[in-house]
Amino acid sequence: MTTITITRPDDWHIHLRDGAQLKDTVRDISRYMGRAIVMPNLVPPAIDTETALAYYDRIKAQVPAGSQFEPLMVLYLTDKTSPDEIRKAKASGKIVAAKLYPAGATTNSDSGVTDVKNIYPVLQAMQEVGMLFLVHGEVTDSAIDIFDRERVFIENILSKIVADFPALKIVLEHITTKDAVDFVTQASDNVAATITAHHLLYNRNHMLAGGIRPHFYCLPILKRNTHQQALLGAAASGNKKFFLGTDSAPHAKDKKEAACGCAGSYTAHAAIELYAEAFESVNALDKLEAFASFNGPDFYNLPRNSDTITLVKKSWDVPATYPLGDTNVVPIRAGEAIDWQVE
C-alpha cells in the first residue's frame, strides 16, 4: 500500500507548553490533527477552571489561519480540588477531563495528588457529571523499580478506583506494558487507554544499548521488547478501547542532553506519519483509521472529524532540530528518515 486516506485524526494526549513555545508546538500538531487533549502540567499547573480557560485562549491565539484545530482542556487534580470545581469545569464546555498526576511522577507533577483517597469526592462528582478521568499510571515510591511502576500502579491503585467508580470513564494514558494492555482489555467499556508512537516503535534497547540516547527518555519509561510487542498488538487489534495519544513532550535540547536530563519525547512534528510506520510494521494499516480517528472521539462521546487526510509512502528526512520558542527541540527520528508523509 503506497497511499492511505483516513478521517482526520485527533491527539488524545499532548503537551503544548506555554509562552514563546506555544507558537511552535501548536503549529506542529495543528497541521493534521483536528483536536487534541492538552495536558495541564504547566508552571503553575491549570488547577482551576479560570486557569484552564485562559490557557485555552492562549492556544487558540496561536492556531494558524485556515486551521480548524480545537484544543480540549484538562483540569489538573490536586489534594485540594473540590467537587464544585469539577462541576464548574464541566459547565464551561471547554474542559472535558481532569487528570491524575501522582505527586512527583513526571514533569511538573509536584502539585499532584499525594493519596488517591484524597480525591474520592472529586471522582464521585466526575462520575455524576460525566467528566473523563485521565490517569498517569505510575506509583512514585522510590523503592519500586522504575520499570515496574506502571504495573504496581495498576495492581495497587487503579484496580481499586475502577471497582469503586464503575460508571466513571477512565483513560489510562500512554500505556507501556503488557500488564496495562491486559488490564484495559479485561476491564469494563468505561476503561480505555492511549498509546504513543514512540512506545510502538521503540523499546529500552533503543535508549540504552550502544550508548545512552536521551531523546528516547520519557515517562513512563520505554520497556522491554515483549511489552512493545503487546502494545503493537493492542493498537493493531481493532479494539475500540485503544486510541492515539502522542504524549509529545518538548524540552529544549540542552535540557535533554544533560547530566540529569528531562523526561519527554517530541513527536508532534510527524505524529501520524510515525504511527503509520508502526502499523505498517505489523501489516495493520487497515486498522490505523479506527485507532487514530474513531476510537478516541467515540470514547469521549464527541463527533468524529468529517474531513480526511492522505498519507503517502514517501521517505523524507527529519531535521536535526525544530524551533521551540527561543530555543530548539530535538525530535524523535532527528536526522533520519520517516517512511510516510501527509500529502
Curated annotation (Swiss-Prot):
Kindly state what the record says about how the cofactor is bound. Binds 2 Zn(2+) ions per subunit.
Which positions are annotated as binding Zn(2+) 2?
K99, H136, H174
Q: What keywords tag this UniProt record?
A: Hydrolase, Metal-binding, Pyrimidine biosynthesis, Zinc
Give the catalytic activity: (S)-dihydroorotate + H2O = N-carbamoyl-L-aspartate + H(+)
Query: Which residues are recorded as binding substrate?
Result: H15, L16, R17, N41, H136, L219, H251, A263
UniProt entry tagged with the keyword Oxidoreductase: no
Record's InterPro entries?
Amidohydro-rel, DHOdimr, Dihydroorotase_CS, Metal_Hydrolase
Q: Which GO terms describe its molecular function?
A: dihydroorotase activity; zinc ion binding
Return the GO cellular component terms, semicolon-separated: cytosol
Q: What is its EC number?
A: 3.5.2.3
Positions in coiled-coil regions: none
Q: Which residues bind Zn(2+) 1?
A: H13, H15, K99, D247
- Quote the pathway field: Pyrimidine metabolism; UMP biosynthesis via de novo pathway; (S)-dihydroorotate from bicarbonate: step 3/3
Names of the cofactor(s): Zn(2+)
User: What biological processes does GO assign it?
Assistant: 'de novo' pyrimidine nucleobase biosynthetic process; 'de novo' UMP biosynthetic process
- Name the active site residues: D247
| Matching Pfam families | Amidohydro_1
The N6-carboxylysine modification is found at K99
Has UniProt tagged this entry with the keyword Metal-binding?
Answer: yes
Q: Which Gene3D superfamilies match?
A: Metal-dependent hydrolases
Q: Which family does it belong to?
A: Belongs to the metallo-dependent hydrolases superfamily. DHOase family. Class II DHOase subfamily.
Q: What does this protein do?
A: Catalyzes the reversible cyclization of carbamoyl aspartate to dihydroorotate.
Q: How does it assemble?
A: Homodimer.
Name of protein: Dihydroorotase
Q: Give the lineage.
A: Bacteria, Pseudomonadati, Pseudomonadota, Gammaproteobacteria, Alteromonadales
